[in-house]
């Protein structure tokens, strides 16, 4: 697939409407239109620090135990740092009001952020097309089985992407750790959450390996970005 066939700007419709702009290397510009219910989901990174810069509008951010509302006002565009292993998520502060624009970037800047969003959206937007593809076995399944297939296929592919591109979801978050006052209990619960998340993603990775699934696919990724990512993987394996 050529670069021209892989868009740098990807839009998903309401109610969880969002626009991902990967036009500038090293950052992803995320736009949330009015009334969007989009939520990043609670997660953490283990090999990257992340930076969230609020360019327009107001967002609600959870970072560790803190919850804050951050606005871009009068030309001020605040940026917050999300250190490795810090649980975090963000969304619009309110459904009404102007559109929200946030720039996400990571350090080290290896372009994994853009590759993550290209492939995440590729899976989410293209998997349902299998149902109408006459060459696909899935299109011949009964409607109930088609729904079951998508409910399994999409999360499986996403979990493989999460595992390989440093985006670890918090699957449990019960009880909410911020409400646990005992430090030893909180530490134990967080370790349990960490083990559960890694175990789920590892099982998904094994299942994906058996099925021949890849976290980064050329059909969803611009050719130059794919080649660079693939080269890094080869070099990493040689170094290991």
Model feature map: region roles:
Residues 188-240:
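C-terminal non-catalytic accessory extensions
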Residues 44-61, 65:
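Short, conserved beta-strand element in jelly-roll/cupin
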Residues 1-39, 174:
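A short, N-terminal "cap"/entry segment at the start of jelly-roll beta-barrel domains
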Residues 60, 67-69, 97, 108:
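Short, surface-exposed beta-strand-loop junctions and turns on beta-sheet-rich folds
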Residues 1-11, 23-25, 91-101, 110-114, ...:
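Cytosol/nucleoplasm-facing, intrinsically disordered, low-complexity tails
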Residues 51, 63-89:
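Short acidic-glycine-tyrosine-enriched beta hairpin
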Residues 24-47, 74-83:
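Conserved short histidine dyad/triad with adjacent acidic residue
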Residues 94-185:
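Double-stranded beta-helix
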């Amino acid at each position: 697939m050529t670069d021209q066939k892989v868009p740098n700007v990807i839009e998903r419709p309401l109610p969880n409407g969002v626009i991902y702009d990967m036009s500038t290397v090293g950052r992803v510009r995320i736009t949330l239109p009015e009334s969007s219910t989009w939520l990043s989901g609670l997660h953490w990174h283990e090999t990257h620090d992340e930076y969230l810069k609020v360019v327009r509008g107001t967002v609600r951010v959870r970072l560790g135990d803190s919850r804050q509302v951050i606005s871009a006002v009068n030309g001020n565009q605040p940026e917050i740092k999300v250190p490795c292993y810090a649980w975090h998520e963000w969304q619009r502060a309110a459904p009404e009001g102007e559109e929200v624009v946030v720039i996400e970037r990571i350090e080290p800047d290896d372009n994994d952020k853009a590759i993550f969003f290209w492939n995440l959206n590729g899976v989410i937007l293209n998997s349902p097309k299998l149902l109408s593809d006459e060459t696909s076995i899935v299109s011949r399944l009964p409607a109930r089985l088609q729904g079951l297939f998508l409910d399994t296929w999409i999360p499986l592919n996403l979990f493989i992407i999460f595992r390989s591109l440093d985006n670890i979801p918090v699957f449990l978050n019960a009880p909410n750790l911020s409400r646990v006052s005992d430090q030893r209990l909180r530490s134990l619960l967080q370790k349990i959450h960490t083990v559960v998340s890694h175990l789920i993603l590892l099982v998904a990775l094994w299942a994906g390996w058996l099925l021949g699934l890849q976290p980064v696919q050329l059909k969803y990724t611009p050719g130059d970005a794919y080649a660079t990512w693939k080269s890094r993987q080869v070099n990493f394996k040689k170094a290991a």
